Amino acid sequence: SYRKANRSRLDSFTGIGDEKALEILQAVGKELGVETITDVHESHEPATVAKYVDHIQIPAFLCRQTELLLAAGETGKGVNIKKGQFLSPEAMKFPVEKVQSTGNNNVWVCERGVSFGYSDLIVDATAIHRLKQLGVPVIMDCTHSVQKPNKTEGVTGGDPSLIETIALSAMATGADGFFIETHPDPKSAKSDPHTMLQLDKLEGILTKAMNIRKALHA
């Protein structure tokens, strides 16, 4: 996110300023020749954010917000909708239809686990297959899905040792891509330090995932 709007505590880090953050995303895209994506949280944001990034992401907690989905769709950018931790895969049909109603068919859905009690998430092994029945690409959020939310200290916990397992199992069940938050020193990350993948582990996971993908399509 260019702005971390969804934080547990009032004093949690939320960003470095909207314009500065968006300019950094734009510069990264140009310098590395990659496409960029960021969250939006309110319906007035997509039109501005679309000037800086290639794709727009709808956070899981906001995946039913009609005006936000319509505003994202109207930009014409790719829209990645994260599945709420409270929704079934089949219920994602409706957010997808909201974006598509704008004439924008470049829509993806993103699995990120389902709430299990108050302080845990689990990943349903059937979710990827069920989401693919919607006829849109399916992304697996491999890092937020290992969260341990609602900690008393107001900082979300997690188990990053499970990231590789989540990623490889998702690829084996048909995922089209990954969402992975990574950092060279996760403990010093401004957000989600307990679920960040250490950067030097990313290549190995992606190599294994691509081998699985090749085997599936052999």
Residue ranges and their predicted role:
Residues 8-16, 35-39, 58-60, 117-118, ...:
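Active-site mouth loops of central-metabolism enzymes
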Residues 1-2, 35-40, 140-142, 176-185:
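Short beta-strand segments at enzyme active-site cores
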Residues 1-19, 182-194:
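Glycine-rich, proline-tolerant flexible connector loops at the mouths of alpha/beta enzymes
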Residues 15-17, 33-42, 54-67, 78-89, ...:
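Catalytic beta/alpha-barrel core
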Residues 13-38, 72-78, 128-140, 166, ...:
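Alpha-helix-loop-beta-strand connector modules within alpha/beta enzyme cores
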